[in-house]
């Protein structure tokens, strides 16, 4: 009989929720105030997810353009969690702003109302981004992650679909907090979170005592896909194959070292499919089409994010201090008025 896995604790912001009143994190006790959806006129459907349908809408009281996320029937507890987290994070750097919580007067279906972002589909956008653009948007995403982590919240579904970018205005927002959760040390969490290509190794080996560092793996996957122009970077056919794809890059020996450190027992199915793989050098992924996006600093940052051992990954704040972002920090420390001009000028010059 396998023994229990070893414990683990976040390297940063571990006690944030224990230092706050219970009201802050006890989302099950939260009672959202539901307004009337009649204030909002749906204009067009923007998309649908597993848990919701999303529409562009107009607030008829002030003519403001908004996004309305109509929630599909799920447990009340899940809706309360999303609302509580969005309320706690309201006003946070690059976090999508929750404007209102409403219900359809007839069906009583709950809906969340958000600020509108003129998003460019990432599949098109990522093809035209310059080296500087990638640094800029990754830095903006790190601001959002450091903010939510500092508030005791893991996003748990970081991926391109959940990062809205208005490229004209150079505006980024982290959206879809439906899988987000409060971090409490030693709590065991559901591993059925995040989307396959962005799932950290901890999820794929069923290690439940994970933390904010899960989001840093997902961000690393996004960075890899952007600089190498390979979307997604780890392209597994299922959750088992996903770990195999990771092992083919990071190596199997290193994986076994991780499992040993945390006393993790691997699902026997992996014995048939893992094989033996040596660790690959990041330089192996450079080719003529992506060379202009890759630099030694980019590879160094990537290497410090895509680590099996979640405790070894850079935190959001540490990542922001990495030399890869020096050009962005330098630009953002210029007088404000010049920023947008400077940024577009740099983009045009490349």
Swiss-Prot record:
Annotated keywords: Acetylation, Apoptosis, ATP-binding, Cell cycle, Cytoplasm, Kinase, Nucleotide-binding, Nucleus, Phosphoprotein, Serine/threonine-protein kinase, Transcription, Transcription regulation, Transferase, Wnt signaling pathway
Superkingdom, natural source: Eukaryota
Modified sites of kind Phosphoserine: 18, 21, 288
Record localization: Nucleus; Cytoplasm
GO cellular component: acrosomal vesicle; chromatin; cytosol; nucleoplasm; nucleus; protein kinase CK2 complex
Pfam assignment, any one: Pkinase
Top EC class, one word: transferase
Listed GO MF terms: ATP binding; protein serine kinase activity; protein serine/threonine kinase activity
Function: Catalytic subunit of a constitutively active serine/threonine-protein kinase complex that phosphorylates a large number of substrates containing acidic residues C-terminal to the phosphorylated serine or threonine. Regulates numerous cellular processes, such as cell cycle progression, apoptosis and transcription, as well as viral infection. May act as a regulatory node which integrates and coordinates numerous signals leading to an appropriate cellular response.
Note: Can use both ATP and GTP as phosphoryl donors. Phosphorylation by casein kinase 2 has been estimated to represent up to one quarter of the eukaryotic phosphoproteome.
Protein name: Casein kinase II subunit alpha'
UniProt source species: Homo sapiens (Human)
